[in-house]
Amino acid sequence: MFCMETTTIAGVKVSRIGLGTWAIGGLDWGAVPDDVAVATCLNALERGINLIDTAPIYGHGHAEEIVGRALRAHGRREDFFIATKFGLDWNERGVFANSTTARLRQELEASLRRLGTETIDLYQVHWPDTRTPIAETAAQLAEFQRQGKVRALGVSNFSIAQMEEFRAVAPLSSNQPPYNLFERQIDDQREHGQSILSWCAVNNVAILTWSTLCRSLLGGRVHRGMSFDKGDIRRVDPKFREPRFSEYMTAVERLAAFARERYGKSVLELAVRWVLDRHGVSVALWGAKRPDQLDAVSGVISWQLDDAAMAEIDRIVKESVTDPVGPEYLAPKVREG
């Protein structure tokens, strides 16, 4: 039996691997039976994963309902660290950022109801809303914290400037950006000479990475010529369109060979270990919608990549992918009105 690596967020001990529930919501990744989704959450806890990350947008509330069912089935709320989000609205025209005070109050009560809990451990702004002052949003969150409805506050997809503005009003415990072998914007982009990753490390802001496996591209099951069902989010991901798809698959194949020959590991295990070994990363979120998709968790724990391996990984990615693209296509629309 392996021993899960842990860290702390706002003084609470959490697993360094967190369960991501985007796929469990049933939209964007294909349907999953509710009993299987609940079993996935419970199986994660059995493997030492106590942090579950969810959001109202995941299945339009369904993922939160699944997590709530898992909490009730387990019976001990304190065994879980529940992170959810707010700040997105949707209609027939698409998904919009909306962090107004009215929307925030509405979303908090809805999330508490769906999760069946009195308190959310980590409440995160899902995306920046350029039409609502960050200070206004942060002030309302601080009020929720004083009321005991929220324990810790976080953001997702925020720049350094936006995080600075937020924490001038309320305590900031975490940031959740996209980060994986192929998407390194928090490493590469600089604000006043500093990366988001280094800023968070210096300012004691925990990093929880989403898309750790780059929409399953690094999961070991995607292959050349693969097609995706209608409604699958990868159908609109530019990484999965030629000629980029072939370049990314070349990188995956070379990384898989490197992982196997150097460590006896899979490309999935290599990809998650790479994220965990980056300075400043607290938690790598691992998306799963079936218990068996967590089988590889044990292969990620209790080993590390050395500097030579990190350099070789960088070389493989740089040589293989000549026209990289990030996850910008996932950003919500600017709210009307």
Predicted segments, located by residue:
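Active-site mouth loops of central-metabolism enzymes
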Residues: 23-35, 90-105
